[in-house]
């Protein structure tokens, strides 16, 4: 069968997290959204429809998929924001002998389409018009499913997704790696230690609250504590003395120390030292300096407000997230200096270099350098040079397609950044009493 995962116009709601990748490449639980669908249909030929400027980079991210090449046979189309549903629902959709569409919470998110109509559907999906794409498909069926609407949903749903993903693919009570004498496994029947991984003496894996999955070639160093549900990604390292609280998911090749709670690391990110990070989403190639901390709960115990643009921030028009616990969203390639602190629900774009002991603002646009009170633009050439050096340390080359995306994103975010930096300059020149 053919499985076509597509982006819709709501991709923009993910802000900096979706500047350098399709929405379905984001992580929620152990896997990315696309990986969940591919695992549900292991025999399917996967086709991907993304924003045109992402096509080249998507081909490198998903080398086994067809990108922007519509299939010719019957196809199951699924919105790439699909995060949670029952596997039986997915297989029911795929097995349908006729055209049918599926709705969850009033949103049409999937449809089985005959081969003769696939190109019609693809044309309208590329135009961002999912409604017209599927308008002739028979009356939709309502099913139980959840579509992510922002990075906040990925943070909030990740703990439950770790449990579901672990049940789907990782058998508990399996130790294929090395668990050294002196390591402590609490409720070992819910712990999976994959081949090539290492749990060192003095480490504690506690699965009383949910499964703990240690993936291939990962290391949990002495005196580290990992509390389930939790997932430690391929070739990642949990540093000695770290406290990995329930609901945390590390993607591949991360280095994590200090205290982390209910946080998603997309992959290839460093938080080597002490400091707290909670209810947050960390993009790729992020490096957090020692004692970087964030708040994830207001002293007033009221819902956290977030900002999606400089204009919203400057006009104090934050959006009520409805969440009491919400931390930090950090875009790809962003760095922090030692003792950097972030307020509750802060949003930081891609390519930033932030430092200083003063509390960072609740919103920082992409490609900003400096500390509160003296922010300036992070110029693209030195930013890319830093990215290349960081990636070389992990034996990864900066792909031409990703380089081009970074430069495009720098231009794409210019108006937002200029508005923000201009207002900050005025505030420095004419401080309010």
Question: Where are these predicted regions, by residue range?
Answer:
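A generic short-segment signal for beta-strand/edge and adjacent turn/coil regions
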Residues: 16-18, 46-47, 150, 189, ...
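Terminal amphipathic alpha-helical/low-complexity segments used for targeting or macromolecular assembly
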Residues: 1-188, 196, 357-433
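Conserved beta-strand and immediately adjacent loop positions that scaffold enzyme active sites
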Residues: 74, 202, 351
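Extended beta-solenoid/beta-helix repeat architectures
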Residues: 173-283, 299, 329
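A near-ubiquitous, low-amplitude feature marking generic local secondary-structure context
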Residues: 17-20, 131, 137-141, 197, ...
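Solvent-exposed, charged interface segments at domain starts and junctions
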Residues: 1-24, 28-42, 209-228, 232, ...
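Glycine-rich hexapeptide-repeat left-handed beta-helix
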Residues: 8-13, 25, 240-241, 247-425
